[in-house]
């Protein structure tokens, strides 16, 4: 089973509704390890990371995820410290490449992060340095998973976010067919561990898939008539 390592940085996780939601989502996920950088540093007398421990965690993981709030278009300072102290070209991957993804929470609206928005750049462009980092270390860079204005999401949107987040942690890809298959494989697990809204969303996803297949089939039949 794929092992996912989440490197999380947030100065006040206890007061962050988005981070608490994401932590609850991975509760019980044995293949996912999370390291909260601020909590780790709080236990270090010299306020520096143990390079041996951190690098061992990286080496054992198949998929590495950096998770953080977007502060002035970059990660929190503690995550930057972790990168400065832990990452080295000696981690350059040989053989099967690790996958490397970004989970970032943004307080502003999505339309601000466009060429015509107030920021003037898209999120993916602003996160480009992390892609360069992945390239240097020989990791496969995944499309970032961006959460905009979590506090304004409806309950149904949050439940959809929960499933999308778990899928991203395990698979990275957002192909519809792949996600549907993954959902069906894990349906029994969700029935026992997550909310009724998630279970209902799974059923809706399956129904939408069936309707899409039927519609495409009908379109094909109509084309055959010409």
Briefly describe each language-model feature range.
Residues 41-43, 110-114, 149-153:
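A short acidic, helix-capping loop that chelates divalent metal ions and anchors anionic groups
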Residues 78-85, 129, 161-164:
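Alpha-helical scaffold elements adjacent to nucleotide-binding pockets in ATP/GTP-utilizing enzyme cores
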Residues 8-10, 37, 104-107, 146-147:
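Short loop/turn segments at strand-loop or loop-helix junctions that form parts
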Residues 135-150, 162, 171-193:
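A conserved mid-domain beta-alpha-beta active-site/ligand-binding segment of alpha/beta enzyme cores
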Residues 62, 120-124, 155-169:
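Short, electropositive alpha-helical surface patch
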Residues 1-92, 177-226:
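N-terminal beta1-alpha1-beta2 submodule of the flavodoxin-like/Rossmannoid cofactor-binding fold
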């Amino acid at each position: 089973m794929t092992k996912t390592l989440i490197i999380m940085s947030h100065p006040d996780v206890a007061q962050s509704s988005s981070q608490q939601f994401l932590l609850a989502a991975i509760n019980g996920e044995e293949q996912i390890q999370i390291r909260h950088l601020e909590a780790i540093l709080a236990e270090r007398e010299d306020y520096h990371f143990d390079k041996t421990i951190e690098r061992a965690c990286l080496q054992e993981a198949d998929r590495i995820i950096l998770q953080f709030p977007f502060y002035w278009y970059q990660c929190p300072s503690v995550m930057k410290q972790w990168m400065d102290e832990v990452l080295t070209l000696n981690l350059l991957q040989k053989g099967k490449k690790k996958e490397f993804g970004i989970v970032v929470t943004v307080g502003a609206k999505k339309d601000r992060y466009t060429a015509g928005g107030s920021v003037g750049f898209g999120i993916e462009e602003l996160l480009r340095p992390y892609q360069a980092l992945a390239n240097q270390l020989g990791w496969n860079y995944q499309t970032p998973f961006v959460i905009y204005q979590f506090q304004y999401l409806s309950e149904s949107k949050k439940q959809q976010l929960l499933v999308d987040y778990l899928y991203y942690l395990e698979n990275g890809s957002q192909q519809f067919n792949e996600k549907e298959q993954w959902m069906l494989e894990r349906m029994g697990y969700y029935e026992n561990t997550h909310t009724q809204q998630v279970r209902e969303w799974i059923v809706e996803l399956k129904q939408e898939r069936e309707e899409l297949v039927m519609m495409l089939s009908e379109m094909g039949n109509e084309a055959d008539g010409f």
